């Protein structure tokens, strides 16, 4: 109950300031089209920054050796095309793109729940961010998780609205950022293998 009250108070306080910003810009926040805008913006901002106020999701693990699956150690698992949106911390404008996560199964032969990787991406995206930090945080979270992988590689590819709608107004440029941990760190062949997997999957995808 207290958390709900705090949330409502935050919405109220943010909405007040959005209303003030509209007035400073020369708008009338009482006109029909803008009457509910401060509340809508407040709720949207709270949703897009929810990672600041919630604990990191736990990564559920599955031990494949217990399921009779042999030769799983050293297998590369790739979760690709994880759509995400975040807020550029410099302009508070959207970053929209995809993240690909690869990891090498460790000696304990544990793998991560599919949806849990997606939740980790969304968790670190739900805050003011820069893409370079985002991929690092995702990589660290998975590398330090209970699956104990031998290596992690995270690739982010996104459009940044701060360059799309203002400044240079470039509609085509995207930012590619890569974070590596463990065996991926110093092994170019492993990194290239992941890039080849992504390229091959584009040509053979059923979706």
UniProtKB/Swiss-Prot annotation:
Family membership: Belongs to the GTP cyclohydrolase I family.
InterPro entries xref list: GTP-CH-I_C/QueF, GTP-CH-I_N, GTP_CycHdrlase_I, GTP_CycHdrlase_I_CS, GTP_CycHdrlase_I_dom
Native organism: Sulfurisphaera tokodaii (strain DSM 16993 / JCM 10545 / NBRC 100140 / 7)
A GO CC term attached to the entry: cytoplasm
Entry EC number(s): 3.5.4.16
Keyword flag Metal-binding: yes
Name of the protein described by the UniProt record: GTP cyclohydrolase 1
PROSITE patterns, alphabetized: GTP_CYCLOHYDROL_1_1, GTP_CYCLOHYDROL_1_2
Keywords recorded for this protein, A-Z: GTP-binding, Hydrolase, Metal-binding, Nucleotide-binding, One-carbon metabolism, Zinc
Quaternary assembly: Toroid-shaped homodecamer, composed of two pentamers of five dimers.
Alphabetized Gene3D superfamilies for the sequence: 1.10.286.10, 3.30.1130.10
């Amino acid at each position: 109950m207290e958390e709900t009250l705090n949330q409502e108070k935050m919405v109220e306080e943010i909405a007040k300031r959005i209303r003030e910003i509209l007035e400073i810009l020369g708008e009338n926040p009482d006109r029909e089209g803008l009457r509910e805008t401060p509340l809508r913006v407040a709720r949207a901002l709270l949703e897009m920054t929810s990672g600041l106020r919630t604990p990191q999701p736990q990564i559920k693990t599955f031990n494949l050796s217990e399921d009779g699956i042999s030769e799983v150690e050293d297998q590369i698992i790739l979760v690709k095309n994880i759509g995400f949106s975040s807020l550029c911390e410099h302009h508070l404008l959207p970053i929209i793109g995809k993240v690909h996560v690869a990891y090498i199964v460790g000696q304990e032969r544990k793998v991560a729940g599919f949806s849990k990787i997606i939740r980790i991406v969304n968790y670190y995206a739900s805050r003011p961010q820069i893409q370079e930090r985002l991929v690092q945080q995702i990589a660290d979270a998975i590398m330090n998780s209970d699956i104990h992988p031998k290596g992690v590689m995270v690739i982010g590819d996104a459009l940044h609205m701060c360059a799309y709608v203002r400044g240079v107004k470039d509609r085509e440029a995207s930012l590619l950022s890569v974070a590596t941990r463990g065996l991926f760190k110093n092994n170019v062949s492993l990194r290239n293998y992941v890039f080849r997997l992504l390229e091959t999957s584009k040509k053979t995808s059923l979706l």
